[in-house]
Amino acid sequence: MEDNFRNVLIILSAIVITAIFIHGLWTLRKQKNPYKLKTSKDKADPITRDFDRKGFDQDGVGQVKVKPSAENDKINLENEAVTEHFITEGIQLPDDLSKSQIIIKNDVLGDLAGQTSKAKQEELDNNSIQELDSSLEDDWFKEDNSGQFSKGELGDELTPAPAVEKVKKKPTKPKAVHIEPLYEQPVTQAKPARTPINKVSKTPSKATLKRDQIEIDFDNQMSEQAAAPKKIKTQLEPQVIILSVVMPANQQMLGAALLPSLLTLGLKYGEMNIFHRHEDNAGKGKVTFSLANIMNPGSFDLDNMENFATRGVSLFMTLPNAGDPFSVFEQMLNAAKQLAQEFNAQVLDDKRNVMTKQTEQHYLSKIREFDRKSRIALVE
C-alpha cells in the first residue's frame, strides 16, 4: 500500500513540474523578452538655456562656434567640378548618390565613358590642381609675412664679409724630444726592510719533555703504592636454608618405608651418617643439599633402618652452593613436598611455621640477595 501511494505521489509531482515548466516557456514566448528594458515612447524635451548678451548661459558656458575647415571647401569644389563634368557629357546620375561617392567613382566612370576627349580630361586635371593649390593658401596654413622690419630693429646695414680663402696646411710630424737623464746610473727604489721573525724551534720542548720523563722517580711511586692500604676483601658468612618435614602428633616415620623414598629422591648415605644429594644423579660430584634426622643426634643407623622410627626429617642447603642456588632450592623443596605427601606430614620453615607461597618467595629473595652480595665481593 505504501509503495502504491509513493508511486502516485511521484507521478503527480512529475506532472506538476512539467506543467510549471511549460507555463514558463509559454509566458516567455508571449512576452518575447521580459528582461529587456522598455524604452519610453515619450521623448525627453531638451533643456532650454537662456544666453545673455555676451553669449553665456547661467552656468557660464558659451555657445558652440563651428569654423569651416579647408577640407570641406576642397571637397565642395571637387564635387562641383565632377558634377559639371557629368552634366556637360550628358550623363544622368541617381538622386540618392552622394557627392563623395561621385568623387570616389570619378576615375572608374571616366575610364568607362570612352566619349570624353583627352583635352577635357586635361582641363579637369588642371582645374583640380589649381583648386588644391588655392586650398593650401587657406588661413589655417598661411603665415603673415607682409610685415617688414625697421632699420632700428635690424640695425646698421650689413656689409658682406670678405671671402676667406681656405689654406691647406701640410701635416707636420712631431719632433722627438730627447731628455738627458739627471743621473748617470738609473736609481732603483729601495725595498722596505723586513722585520726579523724569530722562529720558535720545537726541539727545546721535546728536550724538556724527555728531561721530565728522565727525572721521574719510579722508586718513589712504587713506595707510595706500597704504602697505600690494601683493600681487604669482605668474606660473606655462609647461610643455611632449612626445611623440615614433621609428622602429626602421636605419629612417626618408619625407617623401612623412609629408606626407599630417600633413595628414589636421589639421596645417598654418606658423611656424618646422613643422606646427601650430589650434583650427579649417580651420587658423584659436590653436595648440593643434605637430609638429617630431626631427632638428636640427627644421624641415621643404616644397619638398623628396619627398626628405625622418627618424628620427622630436616633438609638443608648452604650458601654459597656448589650448584645453582635457585635450582638446588627447587629440588630440595620438591623433595620435602614429596615426603610430606607420602607420610601425611607437613612442610615447615626454619621457624617451624607451615610453609606457604609467601615463605617460598622470602627464601628466593634471600638467595637472590646473597647472590648479589657475592658478585659484588668478587668484583672488589
From Swiss-Prot:
It is a single-pass type I membrane protein. GO terms for biological process: division septum assembly; FtsZ-dependent cytokinesis. Residues 29-380 are cytoplasmic. The keyword Glycoprotein does not apply. GO terms for cellular component: cell division site; plasma membrane. It holds the Pfam family ZipA_C. Gene3D superfamilies: ZipA, C-terminal FtsZ-binding domain. Keywords: Cell cycle, Cell division, Cell inner membrane, Cell membrane, Membrane, Transmembrane, Transmembrane helix. It is found in: Cell inner membrane. The keyword Repeat does not apply. Its main location: membrane. It comes from the Bacteria. Belongs to the ZipA family. NCBIfam families: septum_zipA. HAMAP family: ZipA. This is Cell division protein ZipA. The gene is zipA.
